[in-house]
């Protein structure tokens, strides 16, 4: 069996797969759609993250493809319906990076509320700290609205509460008891 890795993934993934099949990693990560189409013909397993899009053209070029392993949560970059029609199984990794995404969300909230990016730029360009130019606001006591309260949204809410924020959330797909 042949496996093609088309994005930066943990070396442990390639090492583990290498025990069972011939593993190749694209020279350019991620490859362009045309490069992928040219190199996917005899591949059985495709390991990727989000680029390039796996559409009908790519799937038709993949004559032997049996499995697409996605090292992320979302599958909106793959024509999953057509993959299923062709007998290609598509797997993702729910929860893989949820905590990292939630932490980054809180980080961006802090950057915006504390003006850290423009303050850093001012210090590096002007070589001085103007403590009055970048007065920020605390997160404590603020209300955070979360649209979509799946794993990541719930984790953002947990972290925000630690900062003393009130969290309100909406998700049409979850039962009411999730929000209490």
What is each of the regions a protein language model found here?
Residues 1-43, 164:
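N-terminal glycine-/charge-rich "phosphate-binding" loop or analogous flexible N-terminal tail
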Residues 2, 12, 22-24, 98, ...:
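Structural/interface elements that position substrates and couple domains in central-metabolism enzymes
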Residues 2, 66, 89, 142-145, ...:
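Structural signature of beta-strand start/N-cap positions in the alpha/beta core
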Residues 16, 104, 108, 155, ...:
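Rossmann-fold NAD(P)-dependent oxidoreductase module
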Residues 25-31, 49-50, 123-132, 178-180:
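Short gly/ser/thr-rich secondary-structure transition/capping motifs
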Residues 41, 54-59, 172-180:
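Rossmann-like adenosine-cofactor binding region
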Residues 44-124, 136-140:
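Phosphate/diphosphate ligand-binding glycine-rich loop within oxidoreductases
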Residues 132-180:
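Rossmann-like dinucleotide/phosphate-binding beta-alpha-beta segment
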């Amino acid at each position: 069996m042949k496996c093609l890795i088309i994005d930066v993934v943990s070396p442990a993934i390639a090492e583990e797969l290498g025990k069972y099949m011939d593993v190749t990693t694209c020279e350019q990560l991620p490859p362009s759609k045309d490069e992928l189409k040219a190199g996917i013909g005899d591949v059985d397993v495709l390991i990727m993250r989000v680029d390039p899009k796996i559409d009908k053209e790519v799937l038709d070029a993949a004559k032997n493809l049996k499995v697409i392993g996605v090292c992320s949560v979302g599958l909106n970059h793959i024509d999953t319906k057509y993959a299923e029609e062709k007998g290609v199984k598509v797997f993702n990794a729910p929860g893989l990076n949820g905590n990292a995404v939630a932490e980054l969300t809180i980080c961006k909230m802090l950057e915006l509320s504390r003006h850290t990016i423009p303050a850093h730029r001012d210090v590096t360009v002007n070589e001085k700290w103007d403590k009055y130019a970048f007065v920020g606001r605390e997160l404590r006591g603020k209300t955070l609205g979360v649209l979509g309260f799946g794993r990541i949204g719930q984790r953002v809410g947990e972290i925000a509460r630690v900062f003393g924020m009130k969290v309100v959330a909406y998700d049409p797909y979850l039962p009411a008891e999730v929000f209490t």
